[in-house]
Amino acid sequence: MKRNLHLLLIDPQNDFCDVPEEYLMTDPVSQKVVAPALPVAGAHADMLRIAELIARAGAGLSDISITLDTHHRYDIAHPSFWMDADGKPVAPFTIISRQDVRDGRYLPRQPDSLVRTLAYLESLEANGRYQLMVWPVHCEIGSWGHNVHADVRATCASWEEAGSRIAMKLIKGSNPWTEHYSAVMAEVPDPQDPATQLNRSFIDRLASADQIYIAGEAGSHCVKATTEHIVEHFDRTQLSKLVLLSDCISPVAGFETQYGSFLSEMQRLGVQIATAAEVLPDLLANQAA
């Protein structure tokens, strides 16, 4: 009997991939080469392995879901939102705490955003998952960096055409007032924006699968946050359905320890960890069923 095998690709986007020169594009306006905004070391190789897995055994996959980090240029986690005490720009990779804002070390550029910003930081820090990080502008809506890695896009397109079906796309991150690492819900859900709240239909879709293979970027952030939220809202007896494809995921540099701790905790809870080569036989068998 054919099994329901689901591939979840988390943010397989150009801005997160350390792609070689031939994958880059030239901006026709500036005539400059457009480079990834937040390249994760190893991500290009991860994408090639994912693409190969789909190309070789895609007929064994019942479903593919692709999450897309999706931001406006003006966003609470982008430099354009912030200034320092002297009114100067805030550099990417700056961590900003609620106390920093209360002390005036960093401030939102728009004064009328102060109260909401403080409330957000208070809620974020109370959750204990992340501090606010100012990232370079990335995955901006409409940009090359927002697009899916070329090899993954091509193999997913072939999978869609061969089966007359769609690879479901999940948009996250377009609310500029909250960070949205997880595809399940934002770090601080906005009560006025359902897109930031728990995506129960997505959880239910995953729960209906016999196996869920998880891959993408980055292991220290969006893969971690998404998987943790899935685990939180899954039946505890079903966690072995989840399989992290360890050679198709890489962490952001400097966050390797957090990624390692995440893998250890997931294993402890019953989530499986495997390589693409190790799951290939199951997909091929399902393809033939």
Model-identified regions with their sequence ranges:
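Glycine-rich anion-binding loop/nest that anchors nucleotide
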Residues: 209-227, 231, 243-249
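Short, catalytically relevant binding-site loops at active-site mouths
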Residues: 71-73, 174-178, 219-221, 250-251
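Active-site acidic carboxylates
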Residues: 1-170, 207-208, 232, 236-243, ...
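Histidine/lysine/aspartate-rich catalytic loop segments that bind and position anionic ligands
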Residues: 154-204
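Short, contiguous clusters of charged residues that form electrostatic/catalytic patches at enzyme active sites
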Residues: 45-48, 150, 197-204, 225-228
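Short, surface-exposed loop/turn motifs that are enriched in glycine and acidic residues
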Residues: 137-142, 192-195, 216-220
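Short, well-ordered secondary-structure micro-motifs
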Residues: 77, 180-183, 225, 254-256
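Conserved residues at the C-terminal ends of beta-strands
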Residues: 67, 173, 215
